[in-house]
Amino acid sequence: MGQQVLKSANEKMEKAVAAYSRELATVRAGRANASVLDKVQVDYYGAPTPVVQLANITVPEARLLVIQPYDKTSIGDIEKAILKADLGLNPSNDGTVIRIAFPALTEERRRDLVKVVKKYAEEAKVAVRNVRRDGNDDLKKLEKAGEITEDDLRGYTEDIQKETDKYIAKVDEIAKNKEKEIMEV
């Protein structure tokens, strides 16, 4: 029973770190990256639709993103949605494709992005710690029910703590790499 709790906690911590990595992908660094548009929703025939489902997005150059809509009539809506998303990007529409040139980040904007990265990192750490707390609570319930001994409880609790430390270190490492990427000129 204790092994199941440990395995479940490990899987949940892994998912929390994976979610954090996906979240960081939407934070814009100095170069073009299609994932910055992941959260952009376009009002397409009255339904909010992710831009990635409406267009082919390519990165032909380091600082250029090209969006080629499958339906040419939606090009204006896609452009409006990108502007409305307030990503600090200025799309230019030539009637068939939308080009987004990524300007070089200012020092101030870089510092703001680092703050965002740190905020996301803290949220990910809280998620990992919540998984630890839930796992420890489950173990205590098992011990109260007599399914595991007090020594087993202590051992499993230590194992969960080791996993927690491992995943928090992973979050810190990912954050450090992203900060380095952002501060790179």
UniProtKB/Swiss-Prot annotation:
- Gene Ontology terms, cellular component aspect? cytoplasm
Q: Where are the transmembrane segments?
A: none
Question: What keywords is this UniProt entry annotated with?
Answer: Cytoplasm, Protein biosynthesis
Q: Which Pfam families match?
A: RRF
Where is this chain's protein located in or outside the cell?
Cytoplasm
The record's annotation in CDD domains points to: RRF
Which SUPFAM superfamilies does the UniProt record give? Ribosome recycling factor, RRF
Chief site of localization: cytoplasm
- GO BP terms, alphabetized: translational termination
One Gene Ontology term of the molecular function aspect: ribosomal large subunit binding
Concerning its family, UniProt says: Belongs to the RRF family.
Q: Which PANTHER family match?
A: MITOCHONDRIAL RIBOSOME RECYCLING FACTOR PSEUDO 1, RIBOSOME RECYCLING FACTOR
Q: What is this protein called?
A: Ribosome-recycling factor
